[in-house]
């Protein structure tokens, strides 16, 4: 018996070699084989009764293979021949029946079989008759209170089709007295008839769109026919405006639904297909109402596995079709989930009858209880992040005064006179501006109008920029027009002719500032890393870090909203981040359309406010005045410029010494740069060279020439406002166009950065009061929104308030994690940080932790791309509801991407860490910064190999310390230092990451004694799974020293690796009290952490592939770490012991219109800070940069393929190596980590 396969496909089984399926069934051990006389265990037989096209489809096979992994389940597929031709008495026997109708299926026979054998039926058979009639479907939906488009039914007698209640007009039809204006939809009443027609109004050209079942690349065709069909019965319904997408929802039981959107077939009838020929499906998040709809549809139609179509329109969700039994295509995660849920439903129902020892499995990730960084066992309730956009091309703008009547006409046409301002971004609007520019330039050839002539170079530039990409997209260009009643005042840099008093328009053209490919990678990587802040990941999916979030997400327990300002780079950053966060695939555009909300409607993330301009103008004037003095900075200048005592500012001022002399140097370096570019352009070898992001040398020259011209004005003074643009441009060229090897670029970078480090932060205020006033001007709407996000967590989900009967299982509010992500530009990030720093959230003189956080922020000199401010809210369910201790808020921060210099002086915080009270068990230590990978030069051996050393080789030492600044050079044994993880070989980076984030389930309350009880294996499943994955990376790379070998995903972009390790600060997580005895645990349970008990090799392989981390061999020196994507500074904890009440009162004080600038802010003496030895030293951060991927030699490619083949599509519960012990492990694991709620309901 042990030799026979347990997954049958009818009589063809004889042709199957059981060996091919060996890993799907339980093999008896040799000892068991000797005891043949013991009775075999009773198997539950699951019968699959459907047409062969369905039962042998890829999704069905994938799911059945996984169901077969249940130890007590055997799957039998009924042959089509038997179904169609044999009486039901001859059909195979089964205990559970999965049967569903499709074209040609004898549903009557299936019903008779179910009556005869009385198996447990997964999808009710009688209801499948009703699903075939759209009228019945609509009737059931209506009875359930589910929204439908407005509809009417036209029933025709086939023998007398003319007698019916239909009146047809030119642009409407009237059915049974109900009028439908075009566009409307006409559907046959039979659900099997897919010929749905949509009729268009004459104003839009009339005609109709005829939809049909997909044929090749078409799903509909336009027809000039405008009259409705005259034979047959139809449902007429209102056409819903859905932005061209339909949402398909697939349930597996009432508590699980997978949703995806596809391009609506009504749009143009062309099926969008990806490179592999599959229809493009977009990711979708169901909202609370839609989750409830899925729940209702599943139960109302009694179909456990059920697909239905949703239309999202007018802020509502309407069901327009219920398809019955259907599976998601091409989603390995769905296959895993579906098989797991179905297997559990079967076991729960039938195991007791057959006396099979099976208990209701509890899902390890059921309630998101996670270790907070302050050492308490709490439930994560809310994550709020404000994030700056990723790496972008330099922003460019050109101003010109225009007086031509055509511009005034356009201004009037677009209602510009209402506000005196106009922003043109839409393709049609930009086309009109381009047409005017072309026309004026043409006129210039015919007559010499002086006003037009004056603007000729600018008109040409306007035309060039608007023609630049061959198409318009609001993402990369915009034109602003401002009405000037008395014309434009002439500046010193322009011609000093007499000023004209007539009205004119100021035209400002903005372009550039697009997200670069590097920026997309940064955002996607950060999204991937963000997953790791979420709970879970202990179950079958523990093949890669952060899987807990994906799990939360697909089981309705993640309430995610992503907001972005209206700038293209910000929206694309948000989409790329979402792609990484939710493990999505494909292009960013569909993700953007489906997932990113534009927040510009209420000024949430855009800054068009005029209230801040007066204060900012005063600040800018003072700043310019100080920086125009041709002398070394005096003590008075230091006092004027750095009243807040910012270390980074003082450092920049020391470097600059004399601002005018530094500007002279910068100017001469720009002149040198432009002459070098001109020289290159004359060189025939490099004249047509392609620079990064398709820029040409000519465009690069134009960019720098404009800066050269604008930086130094006619009177010899420097325009300080151009410094950020100069820094922007040189940073871009150093980072992306380094291959040009232009001279002195690093010197220009260093000087312009020093100037920008003063100008940029100080433009947002010099004194604390100014910083706060300006910050409020930008951020008040956002602060209000953050406050409401934190407050709403305490309320039940709206659905639960409306429908208490449904307040159970996955809909219960305490199981939700709310995530709100706000993507914005530099101004909002600076402003929000100013509010946190200077708004009196905490008192530095009384709160040691806050003082250290402020000291750290004083050293941060730039809020670079991908800067993050993260607020996390936790709930302790054991505390009284009214207690201040019930809700706990943490504040984290990262200054974003690292700079271009190999900067050893990166500011270092105190880690993503446990609270300062957890000092018991501290050990003396010594920090050895030489092991930090980013300090290694290109010619050194890469230390990442040492860093990711296998956990098995050595016991891991966790050093517990209290968080104080780290010194780069020395740290004496008795010096207080941050909690950190280190080992003799420096295994720290990954240990911090695994033991602290989403690892342990239980954490002690801050201040309690650390107990010595060992951590349960379950609590360390996540840790071990990551260690498992990384062990494989390391072992692969250990081989690398002998054989050049890489795990390369075929589709991976070969220039960009990816990483996640360094995105949480490495200083402390390993000391996490969720695993106080990890060191002993690792010593005793080494095997468990890395062998079969955790995850198998194939799954590990897939985890590695998901993380696209690979090492590339340096031709001469072993290893090289290289990437054009700058790595991102780790997230550092600013405070981890805030109460929700404290944060709420603080946000309320900032958001209230009358709030004065708080005076409570503890002042820091700038002199004291300057003299502080701790703050003068800056320490390096331990961050791993992705390696460059080299092609894999053919010999090793085969072995890599072989090792990773079973798991190519991600960690799957079906991937089991061919060993009996592994089989047992997987089975028991499947039974211990099942989805609780899917087993808690009777069908």
Swiss-Prot record:
Enzyme Commission designation: 2.7.4.24
Disease: Deafness, autosomal recessive, 100: A form of non-syndromic, sensorineural deafness characterized by prelingual hearing impairment. Sensorineural deafness results from damage to the neural receptors of the inner ear, the nerve pathways to the brain, or the area of the brain that receives sound information.
Listed result of changing residue 248 to A: Loss of enzyme activity
Residues recorded with modification Phosphoserine: 38, 223, 1006, 1016, 1074, 1091, 1165, 1172, 1180, 1220-1221
Organism lineage: Eukaryota, Metazoa, Chordata, Craniata, Vertebrata
Gene: PPIP5K2
Native source species: Homo sapiens (Human)
GO MF annotation terms: 5-diphosphoinositol pentakisphosphate 1-kinase activity; ATP binding; diphosphoinositol pentakisphosphate kinase activity; inositol hexakisphosphate 1-kinase activity; inositol hexakisphosphate 5-kinase activity; inositol hexakisphosphate kinase activity; inositol-1,3,4,5,6-pentakisphosphate kinase activity
UniProt biased composition (Low complexity): 1195-1209
Region of interest called Disordered, as start-end residue ranges on this chain: 898-941, 957-1016, 1185-1243
Chain sites annotated for binding ATP: 134, 187, 194, 213, 237-240, 246-248, 264, 309, 321-323
Domain remarks in the Swiss-Prot or TrEMBL record: The C-terminal acid phosphatase-like domain binds PtdIns(3,4,5)P3 and InsP6. Despite its similarity with the phosphatase domain of histidine acid phosphatases, it has no phosphatase activity.
Superkingdom of this protein's organism: Eukaryota
A single Gene Ontology CC term: cytosol
Name under which the protein is recorded: Inositol hexakisphosphate and diphosphoinositol-pentakisphosphate kinase 2
Pfam families: His_Phos_2 (PF00328), PPIP5K2_N (PF18086)
Keywords per UniProt: ATP-binding, Cytoplasm, Deafness, Disease variant, Hearing, Kinase, Non-syndromic deafness, Nucleotide-binding, Phosphoprotein, Transferase
Record field: compositional bias (Basic and acidic residues): 915-941
GO biological process: inositol metabolic process; inositol phosphate biosynthetic process; inositol phosphate metabolic process; sensory perception of sound
Annotated Basic residues bias: 958-969
Cell compartment(s), UniProt: Cytoplasm, Cytosol
């Amino acid at each position: 018996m042990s030799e026979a396969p347990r997954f049958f496909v009818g009589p063809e089984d004889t042709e199957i070699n059981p060996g091919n399926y060996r890993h799907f069934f339980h093999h008896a051990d040799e000892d068991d084989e000797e005891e043949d006389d013991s009775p075999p265990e009773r198997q539950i037989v699951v019968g699959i009764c459907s047409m062969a096209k369905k039962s042998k489809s890829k999704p069905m096979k994938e799911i059945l293979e996984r169901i077969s992994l249940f130890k007590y389940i055997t799957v039998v597929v009924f042959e089509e021949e038997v179904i169609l031709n044999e009486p039901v008495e001859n059909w195979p026997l089964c205990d559970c029946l999965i049967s569903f109708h499709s074209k040609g299926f004898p549903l009557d026979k299936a019903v008779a079989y179910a009556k005869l054998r009385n198996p447990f039926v997964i999808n009710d058979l009688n209801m499948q008759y009703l699903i075939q009639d759209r009228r019945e479907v609509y009737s059931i939906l209506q009875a359930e209170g589910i929204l439908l488009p407005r509809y009417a039914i036209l029933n025709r007698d086939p023998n007398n089709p003319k007698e019916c209640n239909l009146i047809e007009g030119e642009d409407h039809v009237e059915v049974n007295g109900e009028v439908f204006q075009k566009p409307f939809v006409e559907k046959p009443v039979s659900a099997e008839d897919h010929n749905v027609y949509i009729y268009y109004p004459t104003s839009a050209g009339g005609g109709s769109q005829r939809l049909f079942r997909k044929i090749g690349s078409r799903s509909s065709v336009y027809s000039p026919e405008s009259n409705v069909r005259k034979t047959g019965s139809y449902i007429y319904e209102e056409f819903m405006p859905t932005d061209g997408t339909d949402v398909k929802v697939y349930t597996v039981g009432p508590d699980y639904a997978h949703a995806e959107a596809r391009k609506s077939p009504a749009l143009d009838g062309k099926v969008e297909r990806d490179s592999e020929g599959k229809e493009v499906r977009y990711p979708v998040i169901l909202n609370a109402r839609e989750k409830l709809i899925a729940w209702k549809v599943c139960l109302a139609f009694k179909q456990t596995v059920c697909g239905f179509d949703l239309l999202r329109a007018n802020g509502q969700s309407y069901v327009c079709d219920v398809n019955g039994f259907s599976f998601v295509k091409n989603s390995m995660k769905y296959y895993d989930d579906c098989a797991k849920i179905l297997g559990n439903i079967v076991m729960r129902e039938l195991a007791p009858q057959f006396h099979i020892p099976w208990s209701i499995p509890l899902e390890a990730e059921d309630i998101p209880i996670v270790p907070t960084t302050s050492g308490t066992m709490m439930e994560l309730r809310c994550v709020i992040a404000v994030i700056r956009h990723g790496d972008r091309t330099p922003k460019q703008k050109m101003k010109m005064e225009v007086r031509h009547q055509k511009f005034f006409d356009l201004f009037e046409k677009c209602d510009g006179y209402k506000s005196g301002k106009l922003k043109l971004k839409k393709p049609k609007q930009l086309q009109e501006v381009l047409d005017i520019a072309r026309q004026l330039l043409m006129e210039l050839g015919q007559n010499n109008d002086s006003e037009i002539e004056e603007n000729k170079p600018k008109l040409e530039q306007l035309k060039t920029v608007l023609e630049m990409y061959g198409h318009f997209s609001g993402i990369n260009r915009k034109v602003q027009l401002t009405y000037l009643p008395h014309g434009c005042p002439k500046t010193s840099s322009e011609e000093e002719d007499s000023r004209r008093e007539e009205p004119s328009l100021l035209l400002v053209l903005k372009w550039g500032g697009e997200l670069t490919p590097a920026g997309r990678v940064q955002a996607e990587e950060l999204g991937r890393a963000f997953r790791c802040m979420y709970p879970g990941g202990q179950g079958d999916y523990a093949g890669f870090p952060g899987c807990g979030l994906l799990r939360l997400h697909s089981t309705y327990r993640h309430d995610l909203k992503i907001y972005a300002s209206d700038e293209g780079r910000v929206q694309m950053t948000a989409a790329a981040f979402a792609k990484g966060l939710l493990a999505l695939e494909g292009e960013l555009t569909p993700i953007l359309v489906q997932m990113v909300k534009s927040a510009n409607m209420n000024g949430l993330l855009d800054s068009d406010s005029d209230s801040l301009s007066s204060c900012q103008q005063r600040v800018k004037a003072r700043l310019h005045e100080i920086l125009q003095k041709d002398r070394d900075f005096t003590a008075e200048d230091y006092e004027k410029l750095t009243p807040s005592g910012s270390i980074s500012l003082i450092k920049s001022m020391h470097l600059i010494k004399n601002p005018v002399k530094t500007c002279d140097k910068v100017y001469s370096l720009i002149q040198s740069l432009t002459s070098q570019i001109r020289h290159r352009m004359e060189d025939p070898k490099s004249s047509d060279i392609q620079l990064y992001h398709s820029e040409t040398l000519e465009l690069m020259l134009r960019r720098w020439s404009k800066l050269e011209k604008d930086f130094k004005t006619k009177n010899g003074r420097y325009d300080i406002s151009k410094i950020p643009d100069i820094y922007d441009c040189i940073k871009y060229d150093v980072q992306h166009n380094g291959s040009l090897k232009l001279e002195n670029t690093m010197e220009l970078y260093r000087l312009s950065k020093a100037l920008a480090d003063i100008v940029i932060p100080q433009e947002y205020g010099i004194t604390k009061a100014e910083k706060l006033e300006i910050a409020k001007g930008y951020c008040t709407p956002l602060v209000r929104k953050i406050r409401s996000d934190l407050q709403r967590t305490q309320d039940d989900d709206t659905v639960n308030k409306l429908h208490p009967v449904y307040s159970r299982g996955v809909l219960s509010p305490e199981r939700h994690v709310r995530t709100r992500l706000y993507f914005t530009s530099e101004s909002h990030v600076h402003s929000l940080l100013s509010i946190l720093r200077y708004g009196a959230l905490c008192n530095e003189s009384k709160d040691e932790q806050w003082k250290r956080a402020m000291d750290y922020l004083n050293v941060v000199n730039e809020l670079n791309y991908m800067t993050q401010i993260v607020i996390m809210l936790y709930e302790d369910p054991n505390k009284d509801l009214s207690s201040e201790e019930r809700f706990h808020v943490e504040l984290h921060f990262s200054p974003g991407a690292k700079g271009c210099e190999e900067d050893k002086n990166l500011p270092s915080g105190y880690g993503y860490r446990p609270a300062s009270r957890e000092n018991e068990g501290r050990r003396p230590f010594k920090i050895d910064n030489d092991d930090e990978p980013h300090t290694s030069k290109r010619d050194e051996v890469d230390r990442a190999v040492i860093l990711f050393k296998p956990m098995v080789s050595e016991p891991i030492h966790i050093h517990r310390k209290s968080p104080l600044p780290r010194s780069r050079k020395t740290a004496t044994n008795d010096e207080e230092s941050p909690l950190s993880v280190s080992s003799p070989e420096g295994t720290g980076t990954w240990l911090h990451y695994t033991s602290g984030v989403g690892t342990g389930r239980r954490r002690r309350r801050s201040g309690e004694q650390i107990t010595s009880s060992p951590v349960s294996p379950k609590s360390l499943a996540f840790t071990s799974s990551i260690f498992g994955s990384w062990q494989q990376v390391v072992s692969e790379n250990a081989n690398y020293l002998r054989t050049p070998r890489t795990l390369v995903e075929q589709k991976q972009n070969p220039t960009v690796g990816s990483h996640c390790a360094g995105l949480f600060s490495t200083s402390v997580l390993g000391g996490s009290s969720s695993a106080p005895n990890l060191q002993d645990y690792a010593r005793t349970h080494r095997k468990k952490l890395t062998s079969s008990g955790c995850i198998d090799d194939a799954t590990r392989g897939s985890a590695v592939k998901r993380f696209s981390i690979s090492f590339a061999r340096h031709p001469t020196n072993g290893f090289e770490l290289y990437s054009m994507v700058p790595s991102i500074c780790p997230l550092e904890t600013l405070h981890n012991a805030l109460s929700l009440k404290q944060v709420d009162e603080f946000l309320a004080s900032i958001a209230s219109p009358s709030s004065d600038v708080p005076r409570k802010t503890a002042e820091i003496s700038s002199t004291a800070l300057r003299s502080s030895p701790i703050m003068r030293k800056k320490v390096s951060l331990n961050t791993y940069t992705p390696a460059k991927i080299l092609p894999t030699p053919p010999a090793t490619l085969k072995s890599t393929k072989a090792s990773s083949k079973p798991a190519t599509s991600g960690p799957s519960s079906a991937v089991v190596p061919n060993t009996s012990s592994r089989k047992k492990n997987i089975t028991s694991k499947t039974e211990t980590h099942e989805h609780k709620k899917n087993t808690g309901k009777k069908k």
